[in-house]
Amino acid sequence: MTRRRDFGALRRLPSGRWQARFRLPTGERVTAPRTFPTKADAARWLSAAEVDRARGLWIDPRAGAVRLEEYAWAWLDSRVRLAPRTREIYESQLANHILPLVDNGLPPLGEVRLGDITSELVRAWYAALERSRSVSTAAKAYTRLRQILGQAVADDRLAKNPCRIDGGGTERHPEQRFANLQELYALAGAVPKRYRALVLTAGLAGLRQGELFALRRRDVDLLRATITVRRKRLRLASGEVIEDDPKSAAGRRVVALPRQLVAELDRHLSEYVLLGSDSYMFTSSTDSPLERSNFRMRVWYPATEAAGLEGLRFHDLRHTAGTLAARTGATTKELMARLGHASPRAAMVYQHAAEDRDRLIADRLDLMAEESGLAAVVPLSGRTRKASGDTHQR
């Protein structure tokens, strides 16, 4: 039985459930993507569709009928400017954390239609991912899902993004570890001599490992005491080795070197680097470009154990360089430029790590006051106190 209305129509099906539908100006009929247990429920859907159409917010329910798995892979294929390593990371997030089953009480998200992904489902998926994987993994996967569904909104497949977890994409990293100067030089002394300059360059200049592995002789200018970062070198999970631009445009930079590092690099160039401007700065004992995994197992792990710094990552030397730079009084912008950060957020970490400079700042303020001839206030502990029986005069 069909019920006539000013907008659309309601129909009771033989099953007893209710169906809502209406016609577009083109004459095409649109049916609600689901049936409703009561006439009132169906009427509410129809009324909402009428209001959304009047406001220009209506989304054809059929547009959201595509499964997330199909839409997500198509979205990734459309990202033609992604760096190869970034594409690998996105593929892994989709295949391992976003699309498959993460909890027996939930459907695999990849099998759910876009229009059926609700905020409640996203929250349950996120919580299950935190439990079964880790907080950091859940945050990364959530950020990617939000990005994909944001594109679905832009494509008029969804009216709004169901990813609305406050702080859901915020990663909570453990306290960053770094080596002090004594530990840095202990590490440099623990590695074979051909890697000494590599360790010190990481810990004093703050280059990323891929940037260090890509350095050539022509990138090091001892006269000007600088290193020019032009590229990074890494091996993909597929086994392919790529050399391309640094992580971001800010990664292309010129880094000033302290004198002690210039001396180390001068010695390294004469002893370990082949002639020719395009020769790699840091190589294996066979003069081959360094491989991350081989270096970690054969050089780094034994050195950290010998120096009593087990658990320290090579990337932590970059934290060391950032922290040491912050302790010199470098501003956020200066740290960004030196370390190749595109945003202030990462650079601020090193300023927080250098909070012990706050006492030095206070001491220097005292010195400024003294140099200006301003008398310091005598602290209460330095004053002569009256005996407890003395009468206090008002």
What are these regions (language model features)?
Residues 219-226, 311, 330-349, 374, ...:
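Short, polar N-cap/turn motifs at the start of nucleic acid-interacting alpha helices
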Residues 48-57, 69-134, 148-151, 308:
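Basic/aromatic-enriched alpha-helical hairpins
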Residues 135-143, 154-215, 223, 234-235, ...:
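Basic, Lys/Arg- and aromatic-enriched nucleic-acid-binding interface segment
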Residues 1, 189, 224, 233-261, ...:
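C-terminal secondary-structure termini that scaffold catalytic or DNA-interacting sites
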Residues 18-23, 42, 227-229, 257:
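Short beta-strand motif preference
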Residues 1-37, 85:
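Short, Arg/Lys-rich segments that mark the N-terminal edge of DNA/RNA- and chromatin-recognition modules
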Residues 37-53:
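A short, charged, amphipathic alpha-helix used as a generic interaction element across diverse proteins
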Residues 104, 186-196, 205, 255, ...:
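Short, basic (Lys/Arg/His-rich) helix/loop patches that form interaction surfaces
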